[in-house]
Amino acid sequence: MVGFKATEVPPTATVKFLGAGTAACIADLITFPLDTAKVRLQIQGERRGPVQAAASAQYRGVLGTILTMVRNEGPRSLYNGLVAGLQRQMSFASVRIGLYDSVKHFYTKGSEHAGIGSRLLAGSTTGALAVAVAQPTDVVKVRFQAQARAGGGRRYRSTVDAYKTIAREEGLRGLWKGTSPNVARNAIVNCAELVTYDLIKDTLLKADLMTDDLPCHFTSAFGAGFCTTVIASPVDVVKTRYMNSAPGQYSSAGHCALTMLQKEGPRAFYKGFTPSFLRLGSWNVVMFVTYEQLKRALMAARASREAPF
């Protein structure tokens, strides 16, 4: 057995909720530069973007984007929006991942044998619910990642200033900008990510190919990351473009997608695919492995506290 041993008592809903948020924050800390590179690549080619310095930069590939940002804006630019990103994960991942098992059991009426339909429904539900809770943090994160530090093109001085400025200039609706594509994206992402992880892990365990420990969690998470990136990239690009757009640039998420298709062609929907996969693949591995271990560690700590002397 590699890592913490599974406890006899299954993790509580609270343990899953806190464990998911904490694991997601750890994963974000490690993979955030890849996410920032993905955002810069996704908005590239958007000629009328609000941050011209960022939008007009010529980024080529993951490494090229990271090197260009470090050269022009300094290493700290790779972590633009990190505070909002961590705020997002604590509210977002806690709901979409931490509540997944509980919602799945609700749809299966407590049965241990969950079908693909119940898993998909649970993933869609928690993914959409998480967006409703965490959308403002996602908007601020994307705005920070998109803005360039060089050339005086910064839109916001701090995370708090970003929330205040968006609310003042665009109204409260501005903080929930892009909710529709984000709900669609996260329903898709959650289904692809959690359901694929669930299915791969169950298959490996039932076929006795692996035991329920770190190698199994690593393999399941990596496979889930690839499947999720392929499925979710188009709606992810639209979400990023729309949330970063100036007021009036696009009338809706659908208009944003149509404009991309007309001006840049179908390939635009897979801009930033490589950093998306590198980020999501590595993020999934770190998050799921950490999450599984945190659940076991927290339950072991709880058991030791409750054990009689």
From Swiss-Prot:
Protein name per its UniProtKB record: Dicarboxylate carrier UCP2
CC per GO annotation: mitochondrial inner membrane
Catalyzed reactions per annotation: L-aspartate(out) + phosphate(in) + H(+)(in) = L-aspartate(in) + phosphate(out) + H(+)(out); oxaloacetate(out) + phosphate(in) + H(+)(in) = oxaloacetate(in) + phosphate(out) + H(+)(out); (S)-malate(out) + phosphate(in) + H(+)(in) = (S)-malate(in) + phosphate(out) + H(+)(out); malonate(out) + phosphate(in) + H(+)(in) = malonate(in) + phosphate(out) + H(+)(out)
Assembly notes: Homotetramer. Adopts an asymmetrical dimer of dimers functional form. Interacts with MICU1 (when methylated); leading to decrease the calcium sensitivity of MICU1.
Primary location group: mitochondrion
Top-rank lineage group of the source organism: Eukaryota
Species in which this protein is naturally found: Sus scrofa
Topological region Mitochondrial matrix: 41-77, 146-173, 243-268
Residue ranges of the region described as Important for interaction with long-chain fatty acids: 16-63, 278-285
Record keywords, A-Z: Membrane, Mitochondrion, Mitochondrion inner membrane, Repeat, Transmembrane, Transmembrane helix, Transport
Residues with site note (Important for inhibition by GDP): 141, 185
Family: Belongs to the mitochondrial carrier (TC 2.A.29) family.
One biological process term in Gene Ontology: glycolytic process
Bilayer-spanning residue ranges: 17-40, 78-103, 120-145, 174-199, 218-242, 269-294
Pfam families xrefs: Mito_carr
Ranges facing Mitochondrial intermembrane side: 1-16, 104-119, 200-217, 295-309
Per-repeat ranges for Solcar: 11-106, 114-203, 212-297
Function statement: Antiporter that exports dicarboxylate intermediates of the Krebs cycle in exchange for phosphate plus a proton across the inner membrane of mitochondria, a process driven by mitochondrial motive force with an overall impact on glycolysis, glutaminolysis and glutathione-dependent redox balance. Continuous export of oxaloacetate and related four-carbon dicarboxylates from mitochondrial matrix into the cytosol negatively regulates the oxidation of acetyl-CoA substrates via the Krebs cycle lowering the ATP/ADP ratio and reactive oxygen species (ROS) production.
